[in-house]
Amino acid sequence: MTRIISWGAAVLATALVVTAASARLRAQGATINKRTFLTFSAPVQVPGATLPAGTYVFRIANPAVQTVWQVFDANERHLLAQFFFVPTGDRTIQEQNRAHGKPVVRFHETPRGVAPPMNVLYYPTNPAGYVFLYPRAQAEQIAALTHQPVLATDSDPTKSSLAHVMTV
């Protein structure tokens, strides 16, 4: 018995398969580059920039290397900051469970009126966090305000995928 499928049905089936496959790839891409939307109600500092209140997209610049975060506006049209990070494993299972699948940000404590600098970002599905490396001058300012050590670098993430890490 020979089955004849109309061209319309074949095109529809192909379109459904392509749509499903592309949706799956987009979902995997968000996991690979750790694409995360964060909304802040007040200004915050990231390495190399102070972000006004608003929504931002944080993502890994190169998933193959995973040493640099990028921060974009909510529409991902403008790159606002690009900086190195180092992994940290200081989050407990209980903390991960309390996050309920949402990203968690830890800030350096600063005096009132000073935009708090982001210290660690925990991606929802990863028990390890990402400690942000601040440019040396900015790290020295943060350390002076917080009286705490701050991880810093004198490396440029636009020129290298490797960072020289120091504590100030």
PLM regions with names:
Residues 1-11:
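Bacterial N-terminal signal peptides that target proteins for export
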Residues 10-19:
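Bacterial N-terminal signal peptides
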Residues 21-27:
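Sec/Tat signal peptide C-region and signal peptidase I cleavage site
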Residues 27-45:
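Short acidic, Pro/Gly- and aromatic-enriched capping/linker segments at domain boundaries
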Residues 54-60:
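A short tyrosine-centered beta-strand micro-motif
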Residues 66-120:
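Mid-chain, structured segments of secreted extracytoplasmic proteins
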Residues 138-168:
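Compositionally biased, proline/threonine/alanine/serine-rich low-complexity intrinsically disordered stretches
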